[in-house]
Amino acid sequence: MNETKPVRTEGTSLPRAGHDEGQMRGRVLVTGANGQLGRALMTLLPQAGFEPTGVDLPEVDISDAAAMSSWDWTGYDVIINAAAWTNVDGAETPEGRRLSWRANTVGPVNLARAAVQHGLTLVHLSTEYTFDGATALHTEEETPSPLGVYGQSKAAGDAAVSVCPQHYLVRTSWVVGDGKNFVKTMLSLAERGISPRVVADQTGRLTFASDLAAGIIHLITSGAEFGTYNLSGDGPILSWADIAKRVYEKAGHSPDEVTPVTTEEYYAGQEGIAPRPLSSVLDLARIKATGFSPADSTERLNVYLQDLL
């Protein structure tokens, strides 16, 4: 049985919200603030009593060592790195490979250096793409085995962050939030009367950005031990095709309009496609042991669709 206790030392919790009316809990730098998770963090952090500063490209490039070295870290308590190059297929191209390694490895190296030098807590977002997907359930102790450039660059960035004494490496998967995402794409197809072919042999659970942000805030305020945590939605394990069928049904269409296919069938004849892990299911025992209860992803999907329809 896998050990559920993180290997790092106990974290130092920031003041709990509400223990002194009006007291701020700390200043947080959020990188990748314009992304799905970044937007959720910028909304929820102030509600939890934090003062967040959000940065993103092109104004701030975390892979620029000189810029990060000259950044005024005075007064910051936490860095949350939600910045990443996430174009999985694009990372397989010569230019994409360079951009992926720059954002996903060099950037975290620079942030880890700053965190160590200034005594900050670094929260870094990772992905199930650091695994090959051959294991049905991924624990925090699983050895990285990335299949493509994106996963390789993320695994290297994770390694850099892991040497930071005060770090939370948060591994997640299948994120849904503000902006373009799989659920919105399927809903658009349903509304236009399109019957899609959707991959059925890749399995996992959706993670809603607001729930992911809430889990991160829990880690930095609860005194949870530093180290690696899996954090995704909970509930039934589904395929992309299963989720698409649920979207079609909620939109008033027949789920039979969605045709399940294998990954190999879906990408047949296409070039430059990155390999995907077939299992994206994360073991959530460790994050639950800290007192955080991940939301049921199917229930959250229903609520999300109600808001969209």
Where are these regions (language model features)?
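Mid/C-terminal beta-alpha module of Rossmann-like enzyme folds, strongest
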Residues: 215, 222-272
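NAD(P)H-binding glycine-rich loop region in Rossmannoid oxidoreductase-like domains
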Residues: 54, 65-105
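SDR active-site strand-loop-helix element
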Residues: 31, 55, 79-83, 122-128, ...
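NAD(P)-dependent short-chain dehydrogenase/reductase
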Residues: 162-204, 210-211
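Alpha-helical substrate-binding/gating segment
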Residues: 187-195, 206-234
